Amino acid sequence: MFIGEYNHGVDSKNRIIIPSKFREELGESFILTKGLDNCLYIYPMEEWRILEEKLKKLPLTNKDARAFVRFFFSGANEISIDKQGRALIPQNLMKYANINKDIVSIGVATRIEIWSREKWEEYNDANIDYEQIAEKMSELGI
């Protein structure tokens, strides 16, 4: 399970450090793709296969389903971690997530989210009513 928040930079070759606690669970390679809220999602291969199967079952006749599947698969890249614990972020994903210099990696149970530091701070500064969200989650059995 991925938990925690880590701050680090991006080098001149668009490489980021994958925190050691995350590397242990990711293995040698993983899938990096566009995420919601203009962040990037990292999935271990096993979790990606589970998501992939669910996405492939969505009806091709549904316009929203097609758009959602395109969104995830068009941005997906298989990424390897080098010996220094770094991973290369493709330029199109850097642009999508507005990543320039500093990033925040957060563990979100089965995936990792990569945020530009600015976007993460904006997200955290937004007036999110977590009590209201908690009520909605309780309706879903959480």
Swiss-Prot record:
Keywords: Cytoplasm, DNA-binding, Repeat, Transcription, Transcription regulation. Signal peptide: none annotated. InterPro entries: MraZ, MraZ_C, MraZ_dom, MraZ_N, MraZ_sf, SpoVT-AbrB_dom, SpoVT-AbrB_sf. One of its GO terms (cellular component) is nucleoid. Belongs to the MraZ family. GO terms for biological process: negative regulation of DNA-templated transcription initiation. Forms oligomers. One of its GO terms (molecular function) is transcription cis-regulatory region binding. This is Transcriptional regulator MraZ. Disulfide bonds: none annotated. It comes from the Bacteria.
